[in-house]
Amino acid sequence: TFEELGVDSIMVDEAHNFKNLAIFSKMNNVSGISSSGAKKSTDMQLKCQYLSEINDGRGIVFATGTPISNTMCEMYVMQLYLQKAALEEMGIYHFDSWAANFGEVTTALELTVEGSGFRFKSRFNKFTNLPELMNIFREVADVQTADMLDLDVPALRGGKPIIVESEPDWYVKQVMEDFVVRAERIRGGGVDPSVDNFLKITHEARLLGTDA
């Protein structure tokens, strides 16, 4: 077992690869909260919890340039890895408690995945009490910004990005229509998620935009 190996400390580079940890919550049908996660992330959580217990909260070092990139839940996951005991001292024993203190669910009209219409969508996407949250996180985080590192980055021609618009050709229009049909099937529950899903459609749509 891991305990029998005698490991008393771990250093994890590219720690963002372990952000996909399953979140258990009473909030239903809210985007940004995933109840499914990767096995490697669950394994990492168990190792971090064990090392934290035998080292009084020490012995774990994460290094990453993107601790948060997709959802607010990734902040909770990082804190769960690195400062679970500190959260529990504040009475935060689970995600819903953390979310009640530091997050908010918003509902807005959004374009559907396939781009054929609009629908109301609830998302966990707004921080509250952000200064307090950052003060807690900085107890374990040494944050280095690009300005602090003084990285040698080449200047962007023109000083800002240039948006190039193009009209869709017949092929792009045909694929977009196919996205609509696929999305309707997925929404109706007539497709196995392992065969087709909204994430797959979104990914293919991004590739289509690049190809256009």
PLM ranges: what are they?
Residues 4-49:
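SF2 helicase catalytic motif II
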Residues 1-9, 40-73, 81-212:
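Inter-lobe coupling linker of SF2 helicases/translocases
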